Amino acid sequence: MIIKTPSPNFVDDPAYIDRFLNECWVGRRVNSPHIVRFIEPPQNRRCLYCVTEYVQGPTLREWMNDNPLPTPADVRNLIQQIAIGLRALHRLEMVHQDLKPENVLIARDGTVKIIDLGAVRIRGIEEIDVPWGQDGCLGTESYAAPECLEGDRATPASDRYSLAVIAYELLTGQLPYAKPPRPSVRRRLRYRSIREFNPDLPVWLDACLQRSVSLRPESRYPSLSEFLRDLGHPNPALTPTEWRPLVDRVPPENWRFIAVVSLVLNGLLIWLVWMNGVD
């Protein structure tokens, strides 16, 4: 077991204390093998703390550092387990809001567990006048959905966006956009194909991820089950069939290589023509 207490550095921060209490409350009500288990504390406790199970294993971030090139099958296994945990929250009308590799643990038996429930938004809590409910985006910028960065309330669609960003990063080691999708830069952002970083990945998988990290919530998958289905099987409705210019299909670094080769070949051709003229 692990006993978790509030940090003494934030004892005077009402929002922090509210989030701590929120985590304890949520943790005791969610029942899923893929969310860290909270244990009911004694009724006569004299200080503020919560008790959770001890999960021996790395965070997903640490696992990613040790496994920079996982197979698509390994990625699907991890994402599916996280999705089961998210589904348990969503069925209780809760949204995690801060899903990221640092908030996921992998137990020694391979079981994946979501942790850090302090930012979980519960439907109706915003009606209560508490500091926690007045906070803006509680998620980490690189994984937070664009609508949350704009100040909108997080929804299950926001969690699905964060999950898809994690899937993208597992497959490529990169994020789908060059910068976090803040309102000031959203119009200039372009989705980066997973094939730019790993050409061996299939087109249909790229199409799945492109839809799941759309900057518009209404364009994303409406459910976790549909996302998981397309993450494991080609969806003909998504696979791009329209013609795209060659300049859009070839990664920028390949164009640099082509330019260098072309320059060398042109130089060789000029030299051969000059040599023939001399003869």
Positions of the model-derived regions?
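Activation segment signature within eukaryotic-like protein kinase domains
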Residues: L78-I79
